[in-house]
Amino acid sequence: MRTRITAVLAAGLLAGCQNQAFNEIGRAPAMSPIGSGLQYTQTPQLAMYPKQPRHVTNGYSLWNDQQAALFKDARAINIGDILTVDIRIDDKASFENETDRSRKNSSGFNLGASGQSQTSDFAWSGDLEYGSNTKTEGDGKTERSEKLRLLVAAVVTGVLENGNLLISGSQEVRVNHELRILNVAGIVRPRDVDADNVISYDRIAEARISYGGRGRLTEVQQPPWGQQLVDLVSPL
């Protein structure tokens, strides 16, 4: 029995040692290799977008249908091109709900009987009452405030059949022993990219924007993995 318990504890210790944070004790968090977050493959879900009709370009014309204007700098339109994503998120939301419900019910009835015989008299009576009372109250309030202003360069990783672009970009900034990571990905239209080769985040379809980090401060803010496991399986 002791051998089994020791084996279980050793397995748990080894599982915890495999954590990346364990390997970074006494050192700053390591940065990811350049280009590790880029994927140049198109997923099957993108087949829902229609194909772009082919346009015949005359050899003597200076106009390009993939550009919004003639006398402006070229913007990102091909795989491998780079454009800048302007992220300016300033959202506030407040929700408040209140519920009050009550119900009261009561009922009762009487029973009685009497009789007489040659030897004795008898009488019997009884009362029965019952009631119920239920009450439910609920009050909930949620407030959220988010503000984020960043510029990040993204790479065109794919071109859909209708001409829209798949973009993906990441940025890592390490300050002391804390690594801040910004990831952005989505689908953009070439015409939405302005003359400075910049696109706003609200022009990105299927946008995936994440801003987080890794390091000592993040580890302190997160509960230990053992406590997270107990919270997950605990019925109370």
Curated annotation (Swiss-Prot):
It comes from the Bacteria. One of its GO terms (cellular component) is cell outer membrane. A lipid is attached at residue 17 (S-diacylglycerol cysteine). A lipid is attached at residue 17 (N-palmitoyl cysteine). GO terms for biological process: bacterial-type flagellum-dependent cell motility. Residues 96-143 are annotated as: Disordered. HAMAP family: FlgH (MF_00415). This is Flagellar L-ring protein. It comes from Rhizobium meliloti (strain 1021) (Ensifer meliloti).
